[in-house]
Amino acid sequence: SGTATNLVAYQTDASCDCLIEADNNGDNFDATPVAHPTLRNLYLVGNGSSENKRGIRLRAGTRANIDGAKVTGKPNPLTIETTQTDDALANGTSVLKNVQIAGVLKNDVTGGKYLSANFLTGQGNAENAQIAATWDDVAGDLSFAWLNDTWVTAVQ
């Protein structure tokens, strides 16, 4: 739970897996309090690995509100893995909006309810988006102007 804003992940090592992995409790997906973070303004660039495929991985009962994300460089840029997480997205407890992914949503839940069609009805959501993947492109993306702030350019 809690809120994080203005996050950048830029992977280069092929052994790196998820750009974000969000879990509630691996031993009890229904455990309370339920993890329910709010994430805003994310730019996530994967390493292009065919073995470490996941960008945003939502599982183990987690809920999430994500507003403003670009995810590229992973074959599965957005993955849903457990029934509780799927249910929270399907019933609106979790909300994804303004999320652009360079690929398609993957729901690994048997009989999953939150599918590409649901994702695409969210405000500003897009699959197969053309997203810049070099650091210069990321830092120059005008829709994420905060990336050009002095605190970001100082750590490059």
Features from the language model and the residues they span:
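Extracellular beta-rich repeat passengers
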Residues: 1-156
